[in-house]
Amino acid sequence: MANLKEIRNRITSVSSTMQITSAMKMVSAAKLKKAQDAITAMRPYAEKLTELLQNLSATLEGEVGGAFTAQREVKKVLIVAVTSNRGLCGAFNTNVIKQAKLVADSYAGKQVDIFAIGKKGNDVLRKTNNVIEVQNTIFDQLTFENASDIAQQLMDKFVAGDYDKIEIVYNEFKNAATQIVRTQQFLPLAPIVGGEVVASDYIFEPSKEEIVLTLIPKSLKTQLYKSIRDSFAAEHGARMTAMHKATDNATELRDQLKLTYNKARQAAITNEILEIVGGAEALNN
């Protein structure tokens, strides 16, 4: 059995760790509330934008979408992997990295590159895949404008023919304890074909076609922003859950160590009493 000093040191160490994990849990809980409010607020906008685009395109004849719907033979693929800059969030990053590798493996024989959003994904994926670009700073100021800049880079690469297909792998936020890994095709868009005519009393200027072609880049930027926002909220949810479990485990370990310490202390006192009694009896004899 370890001596009393060793047990006391372990109790002190575990207690310090417990204070850190508890503080991190509270910080993540506060950040989660803000991130959750942001993603909840933007989802109706993203859905309405998609609905508007579909309704307008349904009134048009033929195929609409221009370069963004160009269906080319897939030879070059870009995977956008959205992870975090920090760890201590359970399997949050690991799940995205695994899925990104699976998606890359599914394009065997083709050129597959990685666009890493988040330091953790870059650190791992660069060892086995070709990471062409890393974006770590967006989480410092997560705004639509900053996400739009990244989306514009991706659109430019596709339109220029650098890639025939672009996919996004990220964690979708459900609740604090649940994140779902999603693989979403970013480009090309599914061809927008005029179908059932949607009744509308709107007057369009300059034209429906031009409005649709303006909405498509806006929709793509919103799609990427939503994916990063989802991932950001999911990260804090995963970290809060992980730190909650770590705090519970540390509390349990500390209690076990205290029990062990008390037993060891009691045994030491008992031994001292026995030694004193034994010594007294020896003197009497």
Segments from the language model and where they lie:
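C-terminal beta-strand-loop-alpha-helix "lid" module of Rossmann-like NAD(P)-dependent dehydrogenases
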Residues: 1-285
